[in-house]
């Protein structure tokens, strides 16, 4: 029996989501379109298999084939990131980070991470996160120019003396200097942990410097710029750290790994290792630069005055409307983005004075410079006349026509 016959409600809602993804433009920087091959194996019989433990050391029988699958995923991950050890079991980036903390430090130890309101992540010590509840947290941020001042980070680190420094961000448009972070960590005897969830796809293509050999441990998601399945990974070059990480993930945080997702990670890594991937990642950055240049030419303020990676962060501190207003206006025109706090923020985190835009998903659909220029100008048109709902509807129809030339999925399920 087909899903349509068995559960038409879920079938119909899934197909409505397919329509939304195909007809609209996805510009949330953390979202992307994965491969049909990834989705195919995620929907396979591998979902049936319990495999607590690690390859060769399972608590259940019948794991000979999933052992081979996980081993293949590990080998591809190590080759991709040029590292010695990899754990591919984390179910998410947040759980990967939780595993890193559990492996390297103890409850009550101090961590230094990027302030959430400056572009950091919940799991980098935010008070509402378990990382801010289990551990004492302190923060560095960006200056008013939107860039990290590494001397300021050094001053904070020397004063606070954290056991672990987290580098990485969810809304930072510039290159992260991992070497400088390692210098600071070494000066105070701290571990350096790099969370590259947002930039991993660029890192493996040589479009952003690698955190290795500087970071003691590196984590990432596998979906954002890597275009794999939703999940997390942890990498290191230190065997002792690797053992602690493995124990922290299982049995510390998780039970049975999701073998259908681990297989999908392996498929995604195969794509990431291809020459085609390097072309894609380069285009992601090129498209982001087109987006940034058009918006600045149209007199919009960008945090840090541009971008080095896959995203731009618009600031509306000089405008009467908020990030939430911009988010809603673009949404009405079929462009999905997200409101975001900015340096010097004057509004609440639920309103914000910024907007985060990313190019990975549009690039996955085949958008290049020409299309990005069109989209960028439409964004500027909408924001220049933010209350004009007729304009928003007209642009929505134009973008729907544009999107129809770049259909990425012919069906909702594989």
From Swiss-Prot:
The gene is glyA. The record marks 223 as: Plays an important role in substrate specificity. Belongs to the SHMT family. NCBIfam families: PRK00011.1. Keywords: Amino-acid biosynthesis, Cytoplasm, One-carbon metabolism, Pyridoxal phosphate, Transferase. One of its GO terms (molecular function) is pyridoxal phosphate binding. It comes from Campylobacter jejuni subsp. jejuni serotype O:23/36 (strain 81-176). Its EC number is 2.1.2.1. It is found in: Cytoplasm. It catalyses: (6R)-5,10-methylene-5,6,7,8-tetrahydrofolate + glycine + H2O = (6S)-5,6,7,8-tetrahydrofolate + L-serine. GO terms for biological process: glycine biosynthetic process from serine; tetrahydrofolate interconversion. This is Serine hydroxymethyltransferase. Pathway: One-carbon metabolism; tetrahydrofolate interconversion; Amino-acid biosynthesis; glycine biosynthesis; glycine from L-serine: step 1/1. Coiled coil: none annotated. GO terms for cellular component: cytosol. (6S)-5,6,7,8-tetrahydrofolate binds at residues 116, 120-122, 240, 348-350. The keyword Iron-sulfur does not apply. Its cofactor is pyridoxal 5'-phosphate. Catalyzes the reversible interconversion of serine and glycine with tetrahydrofolate (THF) serving as the one-carbon carrier. This reaction serves as the major source of one-carbon groups required for the biosynthesis of purines, thymidylate, methionine, and other important biomolecules. Also exhibits THF-independent aldolase activity toward beta-hydroxyamino acids, producing glycine and aldehydes, via a retro-aldol mechanism. InterPro entries: PyrdxlP-dep_Trfase, PyrdxlP-dep_Trfase_major, PyrdxlP-dep_Trfase_small, Ser_HO-MeTrfase, Ser_HO-MeTrfase-like, Ser_HO-MeTrfase_PLP_BS, SHMT-like_dom.
């Amino acid at each position: 029996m087909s899903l349509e016959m068995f559960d038409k409600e879920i079938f119909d809602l899934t197909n409505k989501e397919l329509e939304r993804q195909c007809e609209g433009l996805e510009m949330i920087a953390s979202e992307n379109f994965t491969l049909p091959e990834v989705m195919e194996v995620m929907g396979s019989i591998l979902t049936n298999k319990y495999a607590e433990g690690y390859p060769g050391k399972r608590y259940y029988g019948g794991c000979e084939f999933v052992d081979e699958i996980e081993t293949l995923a590990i080998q591809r991950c190590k080759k991709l990131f040029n590292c010695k050890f990899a754990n591919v079991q984390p179910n998410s980036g947040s759980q990967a980070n939780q595993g890193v903390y559990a492996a390297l430090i103890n409850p009550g130890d101090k961590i230094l991470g990027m302030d959430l309101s400056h572009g950091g992540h919940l799991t980098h010590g935010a008070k509402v996160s378990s990382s801010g509840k289990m551990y004492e947290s302190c923060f560095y941020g960006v200056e008013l120019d939107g860039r990290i001042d590494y001397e300021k980070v050094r001053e904070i680190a020397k004063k606070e003396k954290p056991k672990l420094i987290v580098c990485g961000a969810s809304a930072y448009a510039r290159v992260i200097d991992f070497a400088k972070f390692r210098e600071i960590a070494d000066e105070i005897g701290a571990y350096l942990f790099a969370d590259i969830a947002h930039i991993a796809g660029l890192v493996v293509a040589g479009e952003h410097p690698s955190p290795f050999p500087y970071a003691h441990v590196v984590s990432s998601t596998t979906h954002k710029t890597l275009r794999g399945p939703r999940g997390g990974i942890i990498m290191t070059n230190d065997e002792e750290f690797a053992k602690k990480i493995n124990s922290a993930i299982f049995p510390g945080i998780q039970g049975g790994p999701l073998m259908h997702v681990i297989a999908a990670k392996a498929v995604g890594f195969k794509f990431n290792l291809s020459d085609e991937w390097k072309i894609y990642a380069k285009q992601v950055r090129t498209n982001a630069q087109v987006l940034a240049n058009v918006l600045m030419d149209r007199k919009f303020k960008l945090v840090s005055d541009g971008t080095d990676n896959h995203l731009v962060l618009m600031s509306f501190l000089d405008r009467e409307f908020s990030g939430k207003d911009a988010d809603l206006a673009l949404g009405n025109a079929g462009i999905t983005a997200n409101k975001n706090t900015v340096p010097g923020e004057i509004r609440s985190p639920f309103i914000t004075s910024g907007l985060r835009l990313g190019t990975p998903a549009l690039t996955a659909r085949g958008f290049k410079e020409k299309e990005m220029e069109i989209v960028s100008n439409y964004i500027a048109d909408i924001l220049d006349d933010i209350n004009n709902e007729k304009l928003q509807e007209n642009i929505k129809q134009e973008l729907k026509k544009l999107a129809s030339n770049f259909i990425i999925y012919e069906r909702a399920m594989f």
